């Protein structure tokens, strides 16, 4: 079967919005190639060997690729994509070049092409994210996590995930309960379990995410610790956690902040990321307004993570 690869050159800031445009157009899978995902290479020479050099050679900007089957309405879909991309700046997004190009490919070419950019990556002090299909010889102190995110979910190498992992390393102990909101591939819930949490719950609306996350939970043999649930945190979880982590987007974190306090134990920690730099103050103000105290702000590339706790705890 013939497919059309639609490639959009954009910015790190606009990657998620561009991917959503492609999904709305009916693409079968999205691949993201962003040189900013390897910004950590410059700061930690030990991780250099884990990075595919093809990413480092990219021209400035991120590439978002989606795949459409050849069909009678293909031209119309491409036009819709172009118009939708051109409209994104109206929402305050810097889309960079915003160039849209197409290429005819065979199904077998695109279904696994994204894997070539996903290599074992060390995050924080001890976590190593290893694709299930890659070989990796663990070093002393490494905590290896096996991941197969599928095409639709994060690999763990994005700045937002990296910052969340680094903060989880600080706050997880053997008696910790962790909630991971918008779990996707399940990576942060699994990290929590590997770091010693007694219980971790990952929540996601997407049934595909729930399936992928459960597969990764089994691959890491943490089924006795990690539970993946489909739905809204408020609807499917009735307990409280010591640590809640949400790697989503600023707008959703603002909404979550209205209720998150009721899901945190005394001295509970809320780790939020997926926040672009110019949204930091908006998120901080919402957290404080809803009874949380901001205790740390971390930035990496164009992204931020904010750590807060119940005020007065």
Curated annotation (Swiss-Prot):
InterPro entries: Ribosomal_L11_MeTrfase_PrmA (IPR050078), Ribosomal_PrmA_MeTrfase (IPR004498), SAM-dependent_MTases_sf (IPR029063). It catalyses: L-lysyl-[protein] + 3 S-adenosyl-L-methionine = N(6),N(6),N(6)-trimethyl-L-lysyl-[protein] + 3 S-adenosyl-L-homocysteine + 3 H(+). Keywords: Cytoplasm, Methyltransferase, S-adenosyl-L-methionine, Transferase. GO terms for molecular function: protein-lysine N-methyltransferase activity. The keyword Glycoprotein does not apply. S-adenosyl-L-methionine binds at residues 161, 182, 204, 247. This is Ribosomal protein L11 methyltransferase. It comes from Alkaliphilus oremlandii (strain OhILAs).
């Amino acid at each position: 079967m013939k497919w059309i690869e639609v490639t959009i050159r954009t910015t790190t800031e606009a990657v998620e919005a561009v991917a959503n445009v492609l999904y709305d157009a009916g693409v079968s899978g999205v691949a993201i190639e962003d040189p900013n995902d390897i910004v950590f290479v410059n700061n930690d020479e030990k991780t250099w060997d884990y990075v595919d050099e093809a990413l480092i050679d990219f021209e400035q900007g991120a590439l978002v690729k989606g795949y459409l089957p050849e069909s009678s309405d293909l031209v119309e879909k491409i036009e819709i994509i172009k118009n939708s991309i051109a409209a994104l700046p109206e929402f305050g997004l810097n889309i960079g070049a915003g160039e849209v190009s197409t290429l005819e490919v065979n199904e077998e070419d695109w279904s696994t092409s994204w894997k070539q950019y996903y290599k074992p990556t060390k995050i924080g002090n001890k976590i190593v994210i290893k694709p299930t299909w890659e070989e990796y010889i663990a070093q002393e102190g490494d905590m290896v996590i096996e991941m197969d995110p599928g095409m639709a979910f994060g690999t763990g190498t994005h700045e937002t995930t990296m910052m969340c992992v680094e903060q989880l390393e600080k706050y997880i102990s053997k008696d910790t309960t962790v909630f991971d909101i918008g779990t996707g591939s399940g990576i942060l819930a699994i990290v929590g379990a590997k770091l010693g949490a007694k219980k971790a719950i990952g929540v996601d609306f997407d049934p595909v995410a729930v399936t992928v996350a459960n597969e990764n939970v089994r691959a890491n043999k943490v089924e006795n610790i990690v539970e993946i649930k489909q739905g809204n945190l408020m609807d499917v979880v009735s307990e409280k956690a010591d640590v809640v982590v949400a790697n989503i987007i600023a707008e959703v974190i603002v909404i979550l902040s209205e209720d998150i306090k009721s899901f945190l134990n005394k001295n509970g920690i809320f780790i939020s990321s997926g926040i672009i730099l110019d949204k930091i103050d908006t998120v901080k103000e919402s957290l404080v307004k809803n009874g949380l105290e901001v205790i740390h702000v971390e930035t990496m590339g164009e992204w931020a993570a904010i750590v807060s706790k119940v005020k007065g705890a």
